[in-house]
Amino acid sequence: LVPESSLFMHQSEDYETEVYPVSFTTEEMDATHKQLKDGLFLKQPDWTEYYVNIMRFVNFTSIHLRGCENLLENQPLMSRMRGMGFDIVLTDPFFPCGALVGNIFSIPVVNFLRGLPCGLDMKVNKCPSPPSYIPVPYSGNTNIMTFPQRVINMAMTVVESYQCSLLYGHYDEMVSKYVGNNMDYRTLLSHGALWLIRNEFTLDWPRPLLPNMVLIGGINCAEKKKNASLPADLEEFVQGSGDDGFIIFTLGSMLPDMPQEKAQHFLDAFRQIPQRVVWRYAGDPPKGLPKNVRLMKWLPQKELLAHPKAKLFLTHGGSHSVYEGICNAVPMLMFPLFAEQGDNGLRMVTRGAAETLNIYDVTSDNLLAALNKILKNKSYKEKITEMSQIHHDRPVAPLDLAIFWTEFVIRHKGASHLRVAAHELNWIQYHSLDVFGFILLILLTVLWVTLKCCLFCTRRCCRRGTAKTKSE
């Protein structure tokens, strides 16, 4: 299902698509997207803008919720789909459309995702997340924390709960409208049959998982080939780099360009290195383009990373790009912009396979220093090669694993046997507070009885002593 107005979703010859009308235009979507990304190159976000950024995100998601309503209110399309007898809904739970369709059609839902804001994917699955060693997103902590860091991490769990209520309040309204029974988005998501999570522990910190959560990090990777299939002119350009090799630079599909002043900082640094640079840049070409830099509105990222002459990957740190870098053992210089990208950068830096720079204060000098540091220090290549070997050393490839479990849910019409009983417990029962209370009551009762017995015995002894004294 594809909305007729979309920035990134389009029809494809590889599968059948159904385009449904929506009440907004692509221009409106582009405007909300622009509002979300404006300012990324200007200054570092601070705590004073925390609420403002959340509201921008809410505005960004609101237009997609309108699209969900347009789909659910399209009775001819919904009736036709119901009659087609679908076996499963495969959806990204970032928006509620897929989960709502699955509930309305009474068919299993398989969620396909990297993660949800404020860790909602873990919360709705009742997956244990002890703050003592699992860092809260955006906290800047690793899985090994000092006492002050654990205090901050614990405090941020409270902030995270507040963030959840802001982000998903309008989701709850939509779920209540179309499902009823006072159901909220958390409850709806908790009935998902399976969760295909685009992550795994080569990149992520070790943590508990539940049986209905399957890690498929690297599903988008292409196997590294000695002769990557590149267009002839691009192959000639990268081969011309000689032993120095070339650099791939892209900030993802959401940011195809940047302010001219910022672009000049990159060009000033690139002209001082011997490597050639392939840069995905869809804006107006910057002035004074060096001979070793080639701009492309679109570039074959997988094939370039798989090329034997690829030396460095300049990326925003999105999970797809990071895993493609890991799969092909290419060190990274990361410019985290939003979402999980900062945490991805922290993980890669901690593992010694990357460095990070802030896009808003990058200059030609600090960029050149970072480029030379990674290109001239062999440890980055050694670390990313080790990560790549670990990532590939698995019994089942991520794509095959995702296919198996999706077909499993289809064959068995769900996976209810993987759903933990924690969903049936309230907060007090889940944390065994009623058990602790019962044990405490028993202990207090025993203590009270013991105390009463001691007092009784003491009084009896005192009375006997008094009677004996009087008789004497």
Swiss-Prot record:
<dbReference type="Pfam" id="PF00201">
    <property type="entry name" value="UDPGT"/>
</dbReference>
<dbReference type="GO" id="GO:0005789">
    <property type="term" value="C:endoplasmic reticulum membrane"/>
</dbReference>
<keyword id="KW-0492">Microsome</keyword>
<keyword id="KW-0808">Transferase</keyword>
<keyword id="KW-0256">Endoplasmic reticulum</keyword>
<dbReference type="InterPro" id="IPR002213">
    <property type="entry name" value="UDP_glucos_trans"/>
</dbReference>
<protein>
    <recommendedName>
        <fullName>UDP-glucuronosyltransferase</fullName>
        <ecNumber>2.4.1.17</ecNumber>
    </recommendedName>
</protein>
<feature type="transmembrane region" description="Helical">
    <location>
        <begin position="436"/>
        <end position="456"/>
    </location>
</feature>
<feature type="glycosylation site" description="N-linked (GlcNAc...) asparagine">
    <location>
        <position position="377"/>
    </location>
</feature>
<keyword id="KW-1133">Transmembrane helix</keyword>
<comment type="similarity">
    <text>Belongs to the UDP-glycosyltransferase family.</text>
</comment>
<dbReference type="GO" id="GO:0015020">
    <property type="term" value="F:glucuronosyltransferase activity"/>
</dbReference>
<comment type="function">
    <text>UDPGT is of major importance in the conjugation and subsequent elimination of potentially toxic xenobiotics and endogenous compounds.</text>
</comment>
<keyword id="KW-0325">Glycoprotein</keyword>
<keyword id="KW-0328">Glycosyltransferase</keyword>
<dbReference type="InterPro" id="IPR050271">
    <property type="entry name" value="UDP-glycosyltransferase"/>
</dbReference>
<feature type="glycosylation site" description="N-linked (GlcNAc...) asparagine">
    <location>
        <position position="59"/>
    </location>
</feature>
<keyword id="KW-0472">Membrane</keyword>
<feature type="glycosylation site" description="N-linked (GlcNAc...) asparagine">
    <location>
        <position position="227"/>
    </location>
</feature>
<keyword id="KW-0812">Transmembrane</keyword>
<dbReference type="InterPro" id="IPR035595">
    <property type="entry name" value="UDP_glycos_trans_CS"/>
</dbReference>
